[in-house]
A protein has these predicted regions:
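Short, well-ordered turn and helix-capping elements at secondary-structure junctions
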Residues: 43-45, 61-63, 110-111, 181-182
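Gly/Thr-rich phosphate-binding beta-strand-loop-beta motif of the actin/hexokinase/Hsp70
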Residues: 53-89
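Short hinge/loop at the helix->beta-strand junction immediately C-terminal to the helix-turn-helix recognition helix
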Residues: 37-38, 56, 134
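Short connector loops/turns at beta-strand edges and beta->alpha or beta->beta junctions
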Residues: 7, 82-86, 134-136
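Glycine-rich phosphate-binding loop and adjoining helix at the ATP-binding site
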Residues: 89-183
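A short, glycine/Asx- and small/polar-enriched loop/turn
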Residues: 50-53, 137
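Nucleotide/phosphate-binding catalytic cleft detector across ATP-hydrolyzing
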Residues: 1-50
Length: 183
């Protein structure tokens, strides 16, 4: 819920109502997420309501997921905070007909550069790849990406080895639908 609420967050009392849990359970869950540095609490806006105001819980902006979108002529890399805010985006041109291994290399170099230049104080939870083609759901193996000329390519596994990060992949259109329905 905190992730889906974006930058606006939810108050603890809203989380209690939305999740159907009692206040002490919500306090314990929020406390645990805070100790993991996945959420942050801030003071609520001033209002004229009676009683003690409930803190607002938001997703931490320093915890990010990286995205990779291989295209025919470029690879787009982005950093997205847990609340859904895009922090950085870079498009790196690639040669026509680049194979999967070449795309892995360009992606890994762009990620390394982006992390060093702009995101050194952020914690990466993983990389999500939006592939314009058929992707095997259980392991992200690219079965067929006709626009890229890729057939049976272990792009996800190779990118994980090259970056040392967890990598997941899915069809780009399916991911777009999921993002639209979530945010």
């Amino acid at each position: 819920l905190v992730h889906r609420s974006g930058a606006s967050g939810h108050s603890r009392s809203e989380l209690t109502a939305l999740m159907g849990l009692n206040r002490s359970t919500i306090a314990a869950l929020v406390g645990e997420l805070e100790s993991l540095r996945l959420v942050e609490e801030r003071d609520p806006p001033p209002n004229a309501r009676v009683g003690r105001p409930s803190p607002i819980v938001t997703a931490a902006d320093h915890v990010i997921a990286l995205t990779v979108n291989p295209e025919v002529d470029a690879i787009t890399i982005a950093a997205v905070a847990l609340g859904g805010r895009v922090l950085e985006r870079r498009r790196v041109n690639s040669p026509p007909g680049i194979d999967s291994d070449g795309a892995v290399e360009i992606s890994a170099q762009a990620i390394s550069q982006l992390m060093a230049e702009r995101l050194s104080n952020h914690r990466v939870i993983g990389i999500g790849v939006a592939v314009p083609g058929q992707v095997r759901a259980d392991d992200g193996f690219v079965r067929l990406a006709p626009h890229l000329g890729w057939v049976d390519q272990p792009f996800t596994a190779h990118l994980s080895v090259r970056t040392g990060m967890a990598v997941a992949a899915a069809n780009d259109a399916s991911l777009g639908v999921r993002a639209e329905s979530t945010f």
